[in-house]
Curated annotation (Swiss-Prot):
The protein's name: Ion-translocating oxidoreductase complex subunit G
Keywords linked to the UniProt accession: Cell inner membrane, Cell membrane, Electron transport, Flavoprotein, FMN, Membrane, Phosphoprotein, Translocase, Transmembrane, Transmembrane helix, Transport
Family annotation (Pfam families): FMN_bind (PF04205)
Entry EC no(s): 7.-.-.-
GO MF annotations, alphabetized: electron transfer activity; FMN binding; oxidoreductase activity, acting on NAD(P)H
UniProt keyword annotation of Membrane present: yes
Described function: Part of a membrane-bound complex that couples electron transfer with translocation of ions across the membrane.
Subunit field text: The complex is composed of six subunits: RnfA, RnfB, RnfC, RnfD, RnfE and RnfG.
Recorded family membership: Belongs to the RnfG family.
FMN phosphoryl threonine: modified positions: T175
Transmembrane helix among keywords: yes
GO biological process: electron transport chain
Length: 207
């Protein structure tokens, strides 16, 4: 009987401790959530500014995101609309190169409506350190080679790595990775440029 009481007492105590830990954890979460959200938002803003210069827009880019549902936008996961005084001046969009050496390479691309690439940044990848990871801005300047490059029907052959007859450098011992980034930037830019009417419709959803 005494053993049963002791066991019951310990059970109640452990339950109380578990409840207390849950309450404390929840309290910490709610106290820090706003700060965490603010840090994430600041990081997102900084990344967007790397592909669309500030003088291109005066709207809130973070609040301008649209997830395209139309089949014409296959390969483009999210579009941010940069607007200047209510008019669309550029797009930043997330796209994925499916053919990296070690899998998907997620990209953020800035593009104006005339086909000028304003910037490209890698959001996520699993490429080989010391080889394919040179696509990261913090490791090399290679990704800056896209900035201010135009794409149109007359120069499509230039949008390839030099090994394939294009103008973009490849990496020594790692051609697959830069090829994947160049090709997906090209493919996705053409999707955007060939669907201006649909983009105009989507832009009405944001301020």
């Amino acid at each position: 009987m005494g053993t049963v009481k002791i066991t019951s007492r310990y059970g109640i105590l452990l339950g109380f401790i578990a409840l207390l830990c849950t309450i404390i954890s929840a309290g910490i979460f709610f106290l820090t959530k706003d700060k965490i959200d603010a840090v994430i938002a600041a990081q997102q803003r900084e990344l967007l500014l790397q592909v669309i210069p500030q003088d291109y827009f005066n709207n809130n880019l973070l609040e301008s995101a649209v997830i395209p549902q139309d089949k014409n936008f296959v390969g483009i996961q999210k579009i941010y609309f940069a607007k200047k005084d209510g008019n669309v001046s550029a797009y930043a969009y997330e796209t994925t190169a499916p053919d990296g050496y070690s899998g998907d390479i997620r990209l953020l691309v800035g593009l104006d409506p005339k086909g000028e690439v304003l910037g490209v940044r890698v959001i996520e990848h699993h490429e080989t350190p010391g080889l394919g990871d040179k696509i990261e801005r913090r490791i090399s300047n290679w990704i800056l080679g896209f900035t201010n490059q135009s794409i149109n029907e007359h120069n499509l052959s230039e949008w390839a790595v030099k090994k394939d007859g294009g103008k973009f450098d490849q990496f020594s011992g790692a051609t697959i990775t830069p090829r994947a980034v160049v090709n997906q930037t090209k493919r996705s830019a053409l999707i955007m440029l060939n669907n201006q009417a649909l983009l105009q419709q989507l832009s009405t959803q944001v301020k």
